[in-house]
A protein has these predicted regions:
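A short, Lys/Arg-rich alpha-helix, primarily the initiator
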Residues: 1-22
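Helix-turn-helix DNA-binding elements, focusing on the entry/boundary residues of the two helices
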Residues: 16, 27, 38, 53-56
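Short, charged recognition helix plus adjacent turn
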Residues: 2, 6, 69-88
Length: 88
């Protein structure tokens, strides 16, 4: 997974911001739901900090089952595409 760490970080930044916007949540409110302080959430959203399992699990809990499937499939497809470009 280390090989795709930068891809994951970029993916996370886009997805968490999309989710926050879609749900009409402030950074403060989403930080509260993820059990992190606002400053750390802001760093997560900018890609300064990598999300930990302690952050990802509460985030997944906020998603519907279908959104979780979409989230994981999208990441898998992105990794597969990056891998196929490396091989080519």
């Amino acid at each position: 997974m280390r090989k795709h760490e930068s891809l994951y970080l970029a993916f996370w930044v886009v997805r968490i911001r999309e989710f926050r916007t879609k749900m009409n949540l402030s950074q403060e409110k989403l930080a509260e739901k993820l059990h992190v302080n606002t400053r750390n959430y802001q760093k997560l959203e900018r890609g300064v900090h990598k999300p930990s399992a302690i952050t990802i699990i509460p985030f997944l809990y906020l998603l519907s089952d279908q959104e979780i499937i979409s989230f994981t499939r999208s990441f898998g497809q992105m990794v597969e595409k990056a891998h196929s470009q490396e091989v080519a």
